[in-house]
Amino acid sequence: EAACVSVHGANRLGTNSLLDIVVFGRAAAQRASETMKPGESLPPLAESATQKILDRFNRIRHSKGDVSTAELRLDMQKAMQRHAAVFRNTEVLDEGVRKLGDIAMDMQNVRLQDTSLIWNTDLVETLELDNLLGQALVTIRSANERQESRGAHAHEDYPERDDKNWMKHTVMWLDEKSKSKLGYRDVKLSTLANEVQSIAPVARVY
């Protein structure tokens, strides 16, 4: 299911995830059988591939700031509920971007009381918060840039869908200091095989 990025566009209907599991699970299994042989050894992992992960892990594990994980998580939840709900406007999103930026700065001052490596729920929750905060930042910043309404993004200042200017995927990069870089990618409207026909995008009207 996690492999079905953008298959359903801006708003996936709930039960369609079953199709994702069947289709993409089959594709993943076929690709794995093509690239891996039973009993085949894996090449050694480059140290550079793991050092960045370990540095982040140890930095968070040994954090000795002034703000608790629970406090930061609650601030993030409230900010997203208030400023990144389905119905948004520019003023609300602008304020949300600022608040999430402040919370990201506060994350540098997080406090862990337990530095052990055994059953350390404090560490697990802080690592999870770091991941959630990254997702929250790119979500609200992407929404703030998209000047239209599409799928689950209902922008009250731009109530109509705008295929001419916004028929594109938002791509966001986030660095270790919570600085983001915004980009876009064209939507592929053709299928990758001749088994099915392409379906032209149309407005979803209820």
Task: For each feature predicted by the language model, list its residue ranges.
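Glycine- and aromatic-enriched mobile tails/lids
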Residues: A2-Y206
